[in-house]
Regions:
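Active-site beta-loop-alpha junctions enriched in small/polar residues
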Residues: 25-27, 59, 82-88, 113-117, ...
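Histidine/acidic residue-rich metal-binding segments in metalloenzymes
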Residues: 4-17, 40-44, 64-69, 94-108, ...
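Short acidic/histidine-rich active-site segments
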Residues: 231, 277-296
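Mid-to-C-terminal alpha-helical segments outside catalytic/metal-binding sites
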Residues: 297-332
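Active-site mouth loops of central-metabolism enzymes
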Residues: 22-37, 81-91, 153-158, 181
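A generic, well-ordered mixed alpha/beta core segment in the N-terminal half of proteins
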Residues: 77-123, 127
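An N-terminally biased module of ancient metal coordination in phosphate/nucleic-acid-related enzymes
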Residues: 1-78
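Hydrophobic faces of well-ordered beta-strands that scaffold small-molecule active sites
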Residues: 18-24, 54-56, 80-83, 108-112, ...
């Protein structure tokens, strides 16, 4: 493939102007897995690069509280947050959702779990003596105390009461988007279909699902109105290195996203999928913030630069980093 004309360092920086990173992990975090920067630093760096907004993700806290504070001290910039339904919040917990809706700046998203989905937690583990072993096999305590508390989405039949209540809460607050979280592709398909049934207008298929789903499954979800998320972190050097992403117990260090050998595929594959799905159906972000990666602004610039090298036009990139995130966030 001939490299496209016009690609340059300057162009990748120019395309940050007005951009939105919908997946930023800023501090604080657990001692054994510090963050690269704090939320105020993240906002200041994004603003100084000309970006329009960032969305904070936090596996332990309602990040809309963080957004409320940052918005008070960083002028001329917007940050958003929401709730990830991990076990620290009781998993499938309608009370947590009710609270998040009215807390701080108000939740902008509700995610159905990250490391606390059964699909991911059951597959998290690390290589021991040359063989991948799930944490649930290494530590019976993990299975009893963590795995059994994790979120599962029934793929058929009526939603259980807690899921029904949460979907009703999201539907009643149209400023909030549903984030599938790190569920299985089958569970994500079910959530997208349920969103349509409940009248939920904004849905994001999390990048953890995007890495696992087939192209046909992604096409189905996009055809039903969901945005498909691609994040650069899934394709970096740090992904297959065990870390304490969520659990404070150091023995629970695991490979990111629960992949037996780390995330498979490449950024080229992601680019091919975006082309096939259509950039109008996709959003890119970084999922950066971990201390082994660059700061999120640089991560987004690198993602943009790679897409330019892979033949995406500046207009396509603007769809992915500006127009579509604005639509998801209801920014007009």
């Amino acid at each position: 493939m001939l490299l496209p004309e016009g690609r340059s360092l300057e162009l990748s920086k120019e395309l940050l102007v007005g951009a939105i990173d919908i997946h930023v992990h800023a501090g604080p975090h657990i001692f054994s897995s510090p963050r690269r920067l704090d939320p105020i630093e993240a906002a200041l760096q994004a603003r100084d690069a000309g970006m329009k907004a960032i969305v904070f993700m936090d596996v332990f806290e309602m990040s809309n509280g963080t957004a409320w504070l940052v918005n008070r001290v960083v002028p001329d910039f917007l940050t958003y947050g929401g709730l990830i339904l991990n076990t620290v919040y009781g998993g499938m917990n309608p009370r947590a959702v009710k609270t998040a809706i009215q807390y701080g700046a108000g939740a902008k998203y509700i995610s159905f779990g990250a490391h606390s989905t059964y699909y991911q937690a059951a597959r998290e583990g690390r290589v021991v003596e040359g063989k991948f072993v799930p944490l649930s096999e290494l530590y019976p305590k993990f299975r009893a105390e963590e795995l059994e508390r994790c979120i599962r989405i029934p793929v058929d039949g009526p939603p259980p009461p807690e899921l029904d209540e949460i979907l009703q809460l999201i539907a009643a607050n149209p400023d909030i988007y549903l984030n599938t979280g790190h569920v299985s592709p089958a569970e994500a398909l079910r959530l997208v279909d349920l969103a349509g049934e409940y009248g939920i207008g904004r849905v994001l298929v999390a990048s953890a699902v995007t890495k696992e789903a087939s192209l046909e499954e992604l096409q189905h979800m996009a055809a039903n109105g969901a945005f498909i998320e691609y994040t650069l972190a899934a394709y970096t050097h740090t992904t297959p290195i065990p870390k304490t992403h969520y659990y404070v117990e150091r023995e629970y260090a695991s490979i990111d996203e629960g992949m037996d050998l780390g995330q498979t595929g490449s950024l080229r594959l992601a680019a091919e999928q975006i082309r096939t799905l259509g950039p109008e159906h996709c959003i890119i972000g970084t999922d950066f913030g971990v201390y082994t990666l660059p700061e999120p602004v640089e991560g987004l610039r690198e993602f943009i630069a790679c897409l330019l090298d892979l033949g995406f036009s500046p207009d396509d990139v603007r769809l992915l980093v500006k127009t579509n995130p604005e639509r998801l966030l209801g920014m007009g």
